[in-house]
Regions:
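Positively charged n-region of N-terminal signal peptides that target proteins for export
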Residues: 1-5
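Bacterial N-terminal signal peptides
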Residues: 7-17
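Predominantly soluble domains enriched in secretory-pathway, periplasmic, or organellar proteins
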Residues: 20-358
Length: 358
């Protein structure tokens, strides 16, 4: 009987551990750039579970957390701090376990095949280094700052096979693609008017990469089955300063935040046409995550007022004269197109991250 009780107790502990791991996987992390805080949200209960104040960890009120990415199993998550010039590593218990110094770190992306964390540069930096940061995730040390030639590198993505990391310039129509095995850089130049590619998204099968051009009001589609340099396979008009794209889990639909239209475009990937425009309780929608089951989209709203005519969203973002205010998270039901709920966030929310988000 004692052996049976022990076995049962161990089974309960194992189940509790598995439940804890699953719970960590279902967290959504949102950085509040102007408030130096991070909101941690339960994706199933749709509530703010924890607010982590970076000032209590010794960082400054001007830390400016900008972006966050999460390991697929939820074991660790990473945050870039523009103001304090750091990239941080937290464990699933929200304990700070590592930090790396870097000048004006911006977007982050995880290499799915190697131990690398790639770091772009902040959109608000006047003259950031023309280099891509490479951090070894396990020891959490800076391995390299890889020279990539293009100015103001921002949009960032890694191919699913880990062979290429792509970053795009905000100020030029160019993409730098780094071959991870050799470090060689291949440059793509896109002809025509300025696009200002904000962020990349990869389809679940890794065959397609997209980016919103906020100045051109277009969505650019790239074929990743061919090596760089690229020529856009398609470019479609999407008005409203397209910002962050995200694919649905089945890859059939693309969602795209529209910064000045206060809306989200839903794009049919088979035809590359806008199927519908979703709105309601959106105010300068910025970052976005689609939940693992495709039911909800989580959208961060900056709530900073309209972007001034003739200016890019990057010029307005966090710059002098812009008063950031408390934003919120809009939870959109992607079946009905209706707002499920909203959750208050902190000051100036920007990036969002969750396990298995690409």
């Amino acid at each position: 009987m004692r052996g049976l009780r022990t076995a049962c107790a161990l089974a309960v502990l194992m189940d509790a551990g598995i439940a804890s791991d699953l719970q960590a996987q279902e967290r959504l992390y949102v950085v509040n750039q102007a408030g130096a805080t991070i909101s941690i949200i339960d994706q199933d209960r749709l509530v703010v579970d924890t607010v982590l104040d970076l000032r209590t960890l010794g960082f400054s009120p001007n830390a400016k957390p900008h972006h966050v990415v999460v390991e697929d199993d939820g074991s660790f998550w990473y945050v870039s701090l523009i103001g304090d010039g750091r990239v941080l590593k937290f464990d699933r218990g929200n304990r700070l376990v590592g930090q790396v110094r870097m000048e004006t770190p911006g977007l982050l992306t995880l290499d799915p095949e190697h131990d690398s964390l790639y770091v772009g540069r902040s959109m608000t930096a006047v003259n950031p280094p023309k280099a891509l940061g490479v951090i070894a995730r396990t020891p959490f040390t800076l391995v390299d700052e890889h020279e990539i030639v293009i100015p103001r590198p921002h949009a960032l993505a890694v191919s699913l096979d880990g062979q290429w990391v792509h970053t795009a310039s905000l100020s030029e129509n160019r993409i730098a693609s780094v071959e991870t095995a050799t470090g060689r850089v291949r440059l793509t130049t896109i002809a025509g008017a300025p696009r200002s590619l904000v962020q990349f998204a990869l389809s679940p099968d890794g065959r397609t990469m997209v980016a919103g051009g906020e100045l051109s009001n277009t969505l650019l589609v790239f074929d990743l089955t061919k090596p760089p340099p690229f020529t856009p396979a398609r470019e479609i008009t999407v008005e409203g300063k397209p910002w962050e794209p995200r694919f649905s889990p089945d890859g059939r639909t693309l969602y795209l935040t529209l910064l000045t239209k206060n809306a989200v475009a839903e794009v049919d990937v088979a035809t590359w046409t806008v199927r519908r425009t979703l709105d309601g309780k959106l105010a300068q929608p910025y970052g976005m995550i689609v939940r693992r089951d495709g039911r909800y989209a989580f959208i961060t709203n900056q709530n900073t007022g309209a972007v001034m005519e003739g200016h890019s969203g990057h010029e307005m973002h966090g710059m002098a004269g812009m008063s950031a205010s408390d934003g919120w998270l809009t939870v959109l039901d992607l079946t009905t197109g209706a707002v499920k709920t909203t959750l208050m966030l902190g000051n100036g929310p920007t990036g969002a991250g969750a396990a298995r988000a690409r």
